[in-house]
Structure formats: C-alpha cells, structure tokens
From Swiss-Prot:
Last gene in the exu locus which is required for galacturonate utilization. Catalyzes the dehydration of D-altronate. The gene is uxaA. InterPro entries: GD_AH_C, GD_AH_second, SAF, UxaA/GarD_SAF, UxaA_altronate/galactarate_dh. Belongs to the UxaA family. SMART domains: SAF. One of its GO terms (biological process) is D-galacturonate catabolic process. This is Altronate dehydratase. Induction: Induced by galacturonate, repressed by glucose. Keywords: Iron, Lyase, Manganese. Its EC number is 4.2.1.7. It comes from Bacillus subtilis (strain 168).
Length: 497
C-alpha cells in the first residue's frame, strides 16, 4: 500500500494511507518531509508550512483555517484547525458542467414489473402499521402467516415496517409520518401490503385509504384492529389473499434506466473521500448515463460543499431550490439554538475528519459530476431522471429511510467505521478501507479500500461494482438482508402530545 496521497494538486496536506511514525521521512511531490508527530491512517500531514488563519486545502477546496502556525510535517487535525462555516449565506448562480465520461450500454437487471409501470428489485410482503401501538400484533400476524403458509414464494421475504409514530403528533410531524408510510405502501419492492391500524390513532386508517384509491386492492389490504373480534385471524386471512394475488409474479429483464439508487454515508473516516465516496460518484455518473436516477441527501453534510452542487444546478430554478434546501436546514439548526457546524461526530474525528467542510467535501464525492436535475422536500418522491437532492438530516436511519420512501429501490451506504444497519430496501455497505472489510464480513458487502492499494485501477473497481450492483438488483441478498436487520425511521421536529 502507498504511504500517503495528495488528493488534489492544489492541496497543502497529505493524507496518510497507513500509520506513520514520528521521525519518518516522506518524499512527496518534490519535497522531503520529516514527520513531526505520530500520524494515524486517514489523518492529515502538512505538506508545507501554514500560517495561523491561512486556509487548509484538501480536495482542492478549503476545509477550514489554521488556528495556529503549522510546520511542514505536522499533524493537522482538530487541535490546530477551525471551520470557516457561518450561518445563512448569500449565493449566486454560476453554472459549471462537466461531461459525463460514460455512455449508455443498454444493460438490464432481473426485476419485477408492477401494474403501474414501476420496477422493483425485490418482491416482498409488508405489513405497514399506521401507528406504533400495533407493531407487536403485526409481528405475530406475520409469523403466523409464514407458519401456516409454509412456502411464501413468489415473495422473497416478509417484513413489518415498525415505527414509533402515528399518534400524539401535530402539524408537520403528523404529515411526515403519514406521507412516509404512504410512500412505503406504494414502493415497487413490495408485491403486497397489509395496512394495519388500531382504530383510535391520529393517523387514521380511513384517511390512509382515501389517499390510496388508485392502488390494486388485491395487493393492498386494510385492517383496523379495534373493529374486529379476532384481529389475528382477520389479518392472516388478508395476508393469504394478498399472497394468492401475487402467485404469478416473476422476474424479467428491465433496463438499468429504471434503477433509482440512494447515496448515503455513515461512520465516515479519512478514506471516505478518496475510496468509497468517489466510487459511488463514478457509479452515479455511470447509472445516469444509462438513463437511471440517483439521490443524494444528508443536507447538514452538504454544508461547506454546497456551492459545488449549486454550480451543477441544471437551471436557475433548480439552483434556487438548492439554496432553499441549504438555508432552510441551517434555519432549523438556528431555530433550536444549535451551531450549523456542530459536526463531525467523535467517530469521524477518530477517523481523521477535522471539520464539517472536510466531511462535506468527502460526502459530496458520492454525487459524481452530473448536473443536479431536481430538489425534493422530505417525504416527496422522485420526479426526474438524473441526480436529485433530497431534504433529510444526516442521521443514518432517518436519511436511509427517506431515500427508500422517495422511491429508491436500493441504498448505497459507504462507511469507514462500519454499521450493521439497513433500511427497508437493500442497503449495500461499501467499506472505505480493507481493514474494515476483513474485520466485518457479516456487515460489509463491497470493499472500496482496494482503491488505496498500489496498481489497482479505478475503472477495474468500478466495473466490479457495476457487476455486483446488477446482481443485487436481480435478487442477490446483501448482508443486512441475510441478518434480517431492516428498519424504518421517520424524521420528527415538533411537539409530541
């Protein structure tokens, strides 16, 4: 493995690719550097002397400024680096577009064609509770259905989309819960859904039913638990009816243009911005060249890199949507008396990320170079092809669930620290470093750490990843599916009664 890398020609820091000891001498870009401190892999080394208040540059952009004089060879991290971020900013539209290097290869995956024309990558039977009070009933109901049915084919799996909400909520929180659940019920990865209510909740089953008048009632059933004597018997009977209606479901060839892929990172480290996130960026550009769609979220992790995305707005209308996306989320922080730059997390810092700009510039690598074609509010579903931005926080569970609810059939999740989590659609874990991939083979699905190895070409790893993604879209299970780790989390910002 190489010892270090200079990511961009304008950078004044090196990134350590292995642990480097104090006193080691590095020969880097025409300069001989004696390392002044012990440097952990993923952390930064000063490539030149940096005066107090001067910019620290990584990825070709400032990630903050020096809080003290820094000598060549010194460790650059939170002890001598400060963010440049402020609160609300003014922006101007200065478009800049790069040519997508990929072309349409007319490839396909094996998926499920739905009656409304949508395409799913899984064929699952879901119970969607209108309120958290019936989570337990739903679990028992599904277990009994599986026990009595035996062979659940053609369903790949059965799942309860458990959540804690649906009652005691007001305003936006109530509407968000309702909309996320409605989106889940319509999701193309579900071949059938039982919508299970209690009977006294704010999120009334009758209102949900009104909003779903266009669904196939052989595939989507409704049950209010308080309105029947034996809710278990009634629920299992409805699940069996859905199962019977799905008997003819089978996979067929579907163009890659119909894939909608969410882009997410969590537990990021210093390698995220040079291995896994750029890999997702290249895959995003490749998929968009096939006519497909990708979605980037985690708005707080765009802070400090937002102008790059604004330059890529397809038109001025989209630019203003991005400005509103960023400033509205900053206002959310300000409203709650929180600094907009209170990020990265302790795990991020341990992995070498020093400021939010450092994290954000690495985070946005997942979006490649394609133009931004649309911006969605939380709870909205995809409307356009290409790269879309979605309003949601950085929290792994909430952001991944928001991507799935927006219509993404798969979520790609890069991580340098590791996580077992998955949302209610296939959540592919991509390791930023080989050490994590080898330590957690039951969590991690793909190793982007290869990109830090000597003589490993970007195009080779991309082609391996494309092949793997087509296999996943065609039914190959990822680790969180094998482990049955599937979660739904809904964003809450207001009062609970």
């Amino acid at each position: 493995m190489k010892s270090f890398i200079k990511i961009h020609k304008q950078d004044n820091v090196l990134l350590a690719l292995r642990d480097i000891q104090k006193g080691e001498r590095l020969h880097a870009y025409g300069v001989s550097i004696e390392v002044k401190d012990d440097i952990k892999r993923g952390h930064k080394i000063a490539l030149q002397s940096i005066k107090e208040n001067d910019s620290i540059v990584k990825y070709g952009f400032p990630i903050g400024h020096a809080s003290q004089d820094i000598s060549i060879g010194e460790h650059i991290h939170v002890h001598n680096t400060k963010t440049n971020l402020s609160d609300i900013q003014l922006y101007s539209y200065t478009p800049r577009f790069d040519e997508n290097p990929y072309s349409n290869e007319n490839r396909t995956f094996k998926g499920f064609r739905r009656e409304n024309g949508d395409a799913g990558v899984r064929n699952e039977l879901w119970i969607v509770p209108t309120v958290g009070c019936v989570n337990g009933i739903a679990e028992k109901m599904l277990q009994r259905f599986v026990r009595e049915t035996g062979d659940i084919a053609p369903f790949d799996n059965v799942l309860v989309l458990k959540h804690q909400y649906g009652c005691s909520q007001l305003g936006d929180d109530h509407e968000n819960t309702k909309q996320i659940l409605l989106n889940a019920i319509r999701h193309p990865n579900a071949g059938g859904v039982l919508v299970l209510g209690l009977g006294c909740e704010n999120n009334e089953l009758a209102r949900m039913k009104e909003a779903l008048q266009d669904v196939n009632l052989k595939r989507v059933k409704f049950l209010e638990s308080q309105s029947v004597t034996d809710e278990m018997e009634a629920g299992v009977a409805l699940l069996k009816e859905i199962h019977e209606a799905a008997k003819g479901d089978k996979r067929e060839d579907i163009p890659l243009s119909e894939l909608k892929i969410g882009l997410k990172c969590g537990g990021s480290d210093g390698f995220s911005g040079i291995t896994a996130n750029p890999l997702l960026g290249r895959f995003s550009d490749y998929l968009i060249a096939q006519g497909g769609s990708t979605v980037l979220t985690e708005v707080p992790e765009m802070f400090g890199a937002e102008t790059i995305l604004m330059q890529r707005a397809a038109n001025e209308e989209v630019f203003h949507k991005i400005v509103d996306l960023i400033n509205d989320f900053k206002q959310y922080f300000i409203k709650h008396d929180q600094p907009v730059y209170e990020n990265p997390s302790p795990g991020n810092k341990a992995g070498g990320i020093s400021t939010l700009e450092d994290k954000s510039l690495g985070c946005t690598q997942k979006a490649g170079i394609s133009p931004v074609t649309d911006v969605l509010k939380y709870g909205e579903v995809l409307k356009t092809k290409g790269l879309t931005l979605l309003s949601a926080p950085g929290n792994d569970l909430i952001a991944s669930s928001a991507l799935a609810a927006a219509g993404c059939q798969i979520v790609l999740f890069t991580t340098g620290r590791g996580t077992p989590f998955g949302t209610f659609v296939p959540t592919v874990k991509v390791a930023t470093n080989t050490e994590l991939y080898e330590a957690k083979p039951h969590w991690i699905d793909f190793n982007a750490g290869l990109l830090a190895e000597d003589d490993v070409h970007e195009e080779y790893v991309l082609r391996e990843f494309i092949h793997y993604m087509i296999e996943v879209a065609s039914g190959q299970l990822v680790n969180h599916e094998k482990n049955d780790f599937k979660e739904l989390a809904i964003f809450k910002s207001g009062v609970t009664l």
